[in-house]
Structures are given as structure tokens and as C-alpha cells.
Amino acid sequence: MTSQRTRERLIQRLCEEGISNQRVLDVIRKTPRHLFVDEALAHRAYEDTALPIGHNQTISQPYMVARMSELLLAAGPLDKVMEIGTGSGYQTAVLAQLVERVFSVERIKVLQDRAKERLVELNLRNVVFRWGDGWEGWPALAPYNGIIVTAVATDVPQALLDQLAPGGRLVIPVGSGEVQQLMLIIREENGFSRHVLGAVRFVPLLNGPIA
């Protein structure tokens, strides 16, 4: 089911779970999540759950997409955001409607190619892609006002901290196995402030691109 009623049910659940940024909710409401999953799973697209997309990867739970987007935007509008882990392209599509420019890095080429096609279909033209290692970020185009990481890192990659602009916000899951925490890191005048925001579950952030 991909009816408007099904989408509204998801939005209601996100509100009940504490998502309050109206722009984020509006974008989640109008973004067709069923286009980002296999046809066989389309009937589950508006459930608040992660779903497999192949290559041992998942499309993130809508609540987590909303939560991470809300955290990124909490200090105001952003003009330049880097996403680590394009995956299906769903989080990318949401970001593209919330910020001025998105720079998305993915290590699995076939996933990135599919994501590109979906964003073209949705006429989202403010995203550029890099096929590469997410641990390295995209230093050539740094700094970024915001960075969002859609896979869990064993530690915060120094390269990503280095690419964060002053006042910039990094939203990243950190940990391993079943012990993972969502973190918000802000680049302050004299270093970084770190905020632990609760337990999460993500696939691991791996090294090295795969064709």
C-alpha cells in the first residue's frame, strides 16, 4: 500500500515518536519511499522500519531519517551537507529537499547508480555523488556545514571532523555490534562538543569502494 492514508499513518507515528520539525515531516510525507525499495517490498515502504536493499545494506527506518535530518537542521538552514552512505538514496532525497546542496559518498557503485536514477526521476538536481570510501569523506569540496553518516563507525573518523566547517554539525552513529550510540558533534571555536543521543542500530561503515 502506498496510499496517502498509509503515508499519513507514518507521519502520525513520527510525531508520536517526538519528531517536531514541520519541514522534515512535510518532506517525509511527500517523498515516495516505495521508489527506493524493491517492488516486492513496496507494500512495506511506509512502515517505520528498515528494509533490505541488497549488498548487506538497508534503507534506514523513517524515524531515524527524520531524527537525523532534524538534528542536522536544529541550528537553522544549511547550504552544504555531505552524506556518507548514499545507499538507496532515500535519505539523500530527503536532504535534497531540506538543504541547498548535498554531496553524497557511496562505496558500492551499483547502489549509487540506482540512487542517481531515482533522484533524477524525482527531479532532485542539487545532489552530486562520489564513489569512494566514506571514512575519507570528500576533502576536495570541504568544508561542509553539516555531515550525516548513515552507517555505524567504530570511532568518529578524523577526516570527517577535519571537513566540518566552524559551527558545523556532524550526526553519526558510533559503536559496534549491538552497542551503538547516535552522536551529534558540533565544531566549536575551540574544538568539538559531543552529545550522545541514545542507542541505535545501523549497518557498519566499511572501508574501500566496490564496483
Curated annotation (Swiss-Prot):
NCBIfam families per the UniProt record, alphabetical: pimt, PRK00312.1
Q: Which organism is it from?
A: Pseudomonas savastanoi pv. phaseolicola (strain 1448A / Race 6) (Pseudomonas syringae pv. phaseolicola (strain 1448A / Race 6))
Q: Which GO terms describe its biological process?
A: methylation; protein modification process; protein repair
UniProt keyword annotations, A-Z: Cytoplasm, Methyltransferase, S-adenosyl-L-methionine, Transferase
What role does this protein play? Catalyzes the methyl esterification of L-isoaspartyl residues in peptides and proteins that result from spontaneous decomposition of normal L-aspartyl and L-asparaginyl residues. It plays a role in the repair and/or degradation of damaged proteins.
Q: Which domain of life is it from?
A: Bacteria
Q: Which Gene3D superfamilies match?
A: Vaccinia Virus protein VP39
> What subcellular compartments does it reside in?
Cytoplasm
The protein's name in its UniProt record? Protein-L-isoaspartate O-methyltransferase
Family per similarity comment? Belongs to the methyltransferase superfamily. L-isoaspartyl/D-aspartyl protein methyltransferase family.
